[in-house]
From Swiss-Prot:
Coiled coil location: none
Residue numbers binding [2Fe-2S] cluster: C64, H66, C87, H90
A GO BP entry: alkaloid catabolic process
pH and activity: Optimum pH is 7.5.
Natural source organism: Pseudomonas putida
InterPro entries: Cholesterol_7-desaturase, Rieske_2Fe-2S, Rieske_2Fe-2S_sf, VanA_C_cat
Pfam families noted in UniProt: Rieske (PF00355), VanA_C (PF19112)
Cofactor note: Binds 1 [2Fe-2S] cluster per subunit.
Gene name linked to the record: ndmB
Taxonomic superkingdom: Bacteria
Stated name of the protein: Methylxanthine N3-demethylase NdmB
Amino acid sequence: MKEQLKPLLEDKTYLRHFWHPVCTLNEFERANASGHGPMGVTLLGEKLVLARLNSKIIAAADRCAHRSAQLSIGRVCSNAGKDYLECPYHGWRYDEAGACQLIPACPDKSISPRAKISSFDCEVKYDIVWVRLDNSFDCTQIPYLSDFDNPDMQVIVADSYIWETVAERRWENFTDFSHFAFVHPGTLYDPFFASHPTVYVNRVDGELQFKLAPPREMKGIPPEAPMGDFTYRCTMPYSVNLEIKLWKDDSRFVLWTTASPVDNKSCRNFMIIVREKDNQPDHMHLAFQKRVLDEDQPVIESQWPLEIQTSEVSVATDKISVQFRKWHKELSLSAVEGREAFRDSVLTNVIEEEQ
C-alpha cells in the first residue's frame, strides 16, 4: 500500500509575522556599484527589492505599480536632496514609504494614491538585513546573538548560502546531536560515542534553550574543531545561538546560524562566528565550517518530501526536534486565532529544568 504522506505544517503564513534575514550588509553593498542597491531578494516566496534611501535600507515589493517591471533592476537616484527608487521601464520614482513621487511621462498630472508599492519592516542588525512581512501582531523580535558588540570578541559575518531544503530541516540538522557520529566522524565527533543522553529543553521568551556536554574522551577530533560544553539559545523560528566553552582554554566561541525560507523548496542560510583568545585568521574558521557544511548538505538535501511529515518516526534522542516541531505547529494554529493567541504561543515559557 502506498504510504500516506501529510506535512506537519499545512499553513505556514504565520512565518510572515517573524523577522527573517535576507542578505548580509556586505552582500547588499556588493550588489550594486553604488553600494545603495537596488538588490532583489526572495522571502517566503515573495520577491522583494532592497534599496538604501536617505541613509536607511528599505524593503518593498519588487514590482512597479505601473507595468510590473522588477524595481531591483532599476536604480537609486537623488533629486533635491532626497533619494528615490526608480523603475527601469518608465522611470517612475518611489520614496522610502513606497509612494510614487514622479511619473516622467505625465509630470504635470496628479499622481493616483494607487501608484504605490507595498513596503515592509526592514532593519540592519548584526551586519545583516532583516525583513518582517507582516507587523500586524507586532510581538516578535530580531533573534538573539550573544557578544556581537563585545569589543573583546572577534567577529566573522560569513556570506550567506542556499540549500535546496526547507528551513525546518536545516534548523533540525544544526541542533541534531545523533547525526554527528555518522555524518561528521573525525570532523566533529568520535563514532565510538554514537549514543548520548536526552537533554532538558526549555521554552523561554521565544527561545528553545538546552545544553549538551560532548564526551571529553573522544579521539581523532582535529584541533581546529571548536569542541567544548554547548549551550544553545534558539530564537524561533529558525535561529541558533550556540555558545561553546572551549575545553582547550575555557574561552568562549559562539557559532550563530539562521535559516531563512526563500520559498517552499529552498532556504538561505546565515552564519556568524564570535570568538575570543584566538589568533587564527578568519579563513581558517570559515574553511572548517565549510568542511562541516559540505558533509551535511548532501544528506539534508536528500530528505524527501521536503516538508516535515507527520509520519516520521521519532525516538527519545529526537527530543529537541520534537519540541521544535510541536512549537511550530502551535504557532501555525495560533496565528489563525489572532494576535493575542499568537503572542501567547510565542512568549509563554515552558520550563523543564532551571538552567
